[in-house]
């Protein structure tokens, strides 16, 4: 079985919240795709409830695209501690951390239920499992800790 980089990361050494560049892969025509670890909470210490994580996921899908070019996908980790962000091209962790911070500031602040895309039976595979209240509370907590552009040394972005 192929080795998966994320499973070789020593989860006891990282300091969440952070943005980590996992890898840059180049396609046959030279196109670069970058995979980021957006770790919102400390692994093996806490996990975001599914309704809150689901709502954060739906909001980040649009908010990150508004804040940076080349977003392909932002999907939650099964462990519920953060997200994979896949982008076209090469972006640095500071740029991504700033986009994430700005997105979470919107979620924690002015976001209203109407801002959450894909919350109906025809637009979501589990539309009843959302909580804007939970998403807001998690966003506030994450922001209060600061988002680092480095997983091992706290380099909190402004």
Curated annotation (Swiss-Prot):
For the ligand (Fe cation), the binding residues are 54, 58, 124
- InterPro entries, sorted: LuxS_sf (IPR037005), Metalloenz_LuxS/M16 (IPR011249), S-ribosylhomocysteinase (IPR003815)
Q: Name one GO biological process term.
A: quorum sensing
Question: What terms describe the molecular function in GO for this protein?
Answer: iron ion binding; S-ribosylhomocysteine lyase activity
Any coiled-coil ranges, and where? none
The protein's role, per its UniProt record: Involved in the synthesis of autoinducer 2 (AI-2) which is secreted by bacteria and is used to communicate both the cell density and the metabolic potential of the environment. The regulation of gene expression in response to changes in cell density is called quorum sensing. Catalyzes the transformation of S-ribosylhomocysteine (RHC) to homocysteine (HC) and 4,5-dihydroxy-2,3-pentadione (DPD).
Lyase is among the record's keywords: yes
Q: Which reaction equation describes what this protein catalyses? A: S-(5-deoxy-D-ribos-5-yl)-L-homocysteine = (S)-4,5-dihydroxypentane-2,3-dione + L-homocysteine
Pfam families hit by this protein: LuxS
Source species: Lactiplantibacillus plantarum (strain ATCC BAA-793 / NCIMB 8826 / WCFS1) (Lactobacillus plantarum)
EC number(s): the record gives 4.4.1.21
Quote the cofactor binding remark: Binds 1 Fe cation per subunit.
Please give the family membership noted in the entry.
Belongs to the LuxS family.
Protein name, UniProt field: S-ribosylhomocysteine lyase
Per UniProt, which keywords does this protein have? Answer: Autoinducer synthesis, Iron, Lyase, Metal-binding, Quorum sensing
Needs which cofactor? Fe cation
Note whether Metal-binding occurs among the keywords.
Answer: yes
Q: How does it assemble?
A: Homodimer.
